[in-house]
Amino acid sequence: MSAHRDAIRTARSVVVKIGTTALTTPTGVFDTSRLQDLADAIEARMKAGSDVVIVSSGAIAAGIEPLGLTKRPTDLATKQAAASVGQVALVNTWSSAFGRYHRTVGQVLLTAHDISMRVQHTNAQRTLDRLRALHAVAIVNENDTVATNEIRFGDNDRLSALVAHLVGADALILLSDVDGLYDSDPRKGNARFIPEVDGPDDLEGVTAGRGSHLGTGGMVSKLSSALLAADAGVPVLLAAASDAAAALDGASVGTVFAPRKERMSARRFWVRYAAEASGALTLDDGAVKAVVRQRRSLLPAGITALSGRFYGGDVVELRNQDATMVARGVVAYDAAELATMLGRSTSDLPAEMRRPAVHADDLVAV
């Protein structure tokens, strides 16, 4: 067993993401028996001493039958209505499943926007931490009634990676209808299974297939989220929900994504991945080198242009002359104020404007 698999096996704090297809029949009907089986596997892991936070998809699927619909809706309003009805059924089923073990569950509805805002980010973190301290099982889902982008893309994959870092998890386990990563679509034959991803070189030549019609995620979404979590320092296991018990027990199933050696700080993770960028700064070549290679602060002299309506304390993208993002950071000035400082050396500026435009401590290269 590799060191990374062993780290997942022994992790004290685990986030388990469960996709829509893991909770439905092949025809898209919400399947309570599948959820109960997953709860049994998760209970075994918790009984062994791990804290587990569940990120559960399936609200829209769970709302189809109660609303008398014959298939998953395609229009946004009906999706949101189905999510509203289905979320009740979803959480009640989780509550019943864990009630057999005398455990209490708590519902936490989030959107990517919630996590992008620093105050909401902190509140969500505090709530999840307190639920775990009170020995309740947190059931996290995206708030589909308002999160229009999340309904269309991701199936909670990205949210699970954000939650894993939010709660300081030691491991992230992604469970769906795929048993791991392949170098091409396994449904077409001749695909090579990839048991472990240690870095970008292992993904050379990999082509991700499309997702299932029952959910909104796909291999592209799962791969992106796994790499996000791994880059932040969290080991990831991608496995089939049918292998949930084995995956949670540390068996050699699925694909493991090795984490970076040093875990990213909460603030740097928020700047890099969670925060929404409010604008962009275009840098000259010298500033790009200073920011990316030398990890130095960005001075107004190195900025050639800006865009967006941002204020001091907002996160902005830093771009090179080809408009490629090279870093993200927390800007110190409002857009209107910074516009008067572009290209000017620090010595030419008034004393109150001699702070860096973006301090090195608030910069994350991408």
Swiss-Prot record:
The keyword Transferase applies. Substrate binds at S57, D144, N156. The keyword Protease does not apply. Residues 278-356 form the PUA domain. It is an enzyme of class 2 (transferase). One of its GO terms (molecular function) is ATP binding. It is found in: Cytoplasm. Pathway: Amino-acid biosynthesis; L-proline biosynthesis; L-glutamate 5-semialdehyde from L-glutamate: step 1/2. Keywords: Amino-acid biosynthesis, ATP-binding, Cytoplasm, Kinase, Nucleotide-binding, Proline biosynthesis, Transferase. ATP binds at K17, S176, D177, T216, G217, G218, M219, V220, S221, K222. One of its GO terms (cellular component) is cytosol. One of its GO terms (biological process) is L-proline biosynthetic process. Its EC number is 2.7.2.11. Its main location: cytoplasm. PROSITE patterns: GLUTAMATE_5_KINASE, PUA. It catalyses: L-glutamate + ATP = L-glutamyl 5-phosphate + ADP. Catalyzes the transfer of a phosphate group to glutamate to form L-glutamate 5-phosphate. Belongs to the glutamate 5-kinase family. This is Glutamate 5-kinase. It comes from Mycolicibacterium vanbaalenii (strain DSM 7251 / JCM 13017 / BCRC 16820 / KCTC 9966 / NRRL B-24157 / PYR-1).
